[in-house]
């Protein structure tokens, strides 16, 4: 029986072990019906994580245009920065810095999230203020602390480049080069940034030998402690959750609270959303350090320890942390047929 129906009829009752298992079985059955699980082997279709696709069907001409724009410094006010400055594809789609640095060395208020697999997110930015990739692409360009340029100037500069003008005339017939078509092209390229074929994806598709015993043990621990928030093909991006569900994260972190610490509240102004953030993807997580919205945690083991404490009230052993860390490293995927950990500038530009 679906959990919401059971609880509506037995809202004061306690679930027996058998009833709990029945609900878990129902959840697994529902997951198995998802199209995202279509290429997982039958016995693993009900897992909380689904494999990423090996290929995404896209118009390669628009991908190429968006790719060029992603690395285009004309988008910034002083022409020193591009999207790739904060979302380096050789660094897990981040800048591996505590907070982003904008034009003229300005320090931003928040950690740069990964651009890889971002098309799977329910919204963009840590606070979800952009509904999709196109809306997100428009923001940093006009932000004075990031790329610091006006969109009218961006369009004017790009229009003076014949290659851009001709490409937009061809691919956006009747529209040409505008803010809307530029952000659409960038977003379209970002849809191609899917890092499939990780060792864990291979495991879900039936290669039982691709994971070590330690990694499998880590996955079992992960399912018990982490998968209620980090689920789906990207292990995140599907919900907003409170930072510090069981313990006050900000007290443990120390330091003054910042506006960025408000999280989703900054968008909705609803007190219930204070300190809620979009759950980050854990794909390629070994590369996306430092961790959390504030970039406060330098290494993955400490991030696991902190999350277990503040979200689950668990004090994991050193061995348990190592096992979960080993599992998370099995989530590192490929871009253009090469492991993300091995990409260099030539591979991505």
Where on the chain are the PLM-derived regions?
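Bulky hydrophobic/aromatic "packing anchor" residues in well-ordered structure
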Residues: 1-2, 115, 133, 168, ...
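Short helix/strand-capping connector loops at secondary-structure junctions
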Residues: 2-10, 303-309
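Post-cleavage N-terminal segment of exported redox proteins
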Residues: 7-8, 12-64, 121, 139, ...
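Short, flexible active-site recognition loops that position polar ligands and cofactors
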Residues: 10-17, 310-318
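Short glycine/threonine-rich turn/loop motifs
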Residues: 40-139, 202-298, 302-305, 314, ...
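Alpha-helix N-cap/helix-initiation sites
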Residues: 76-77, 179-180, 317-318
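Central I-helix of cytochrome P450 enzymes
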Residues: 145
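Terminal end segments
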Residues: 320-322
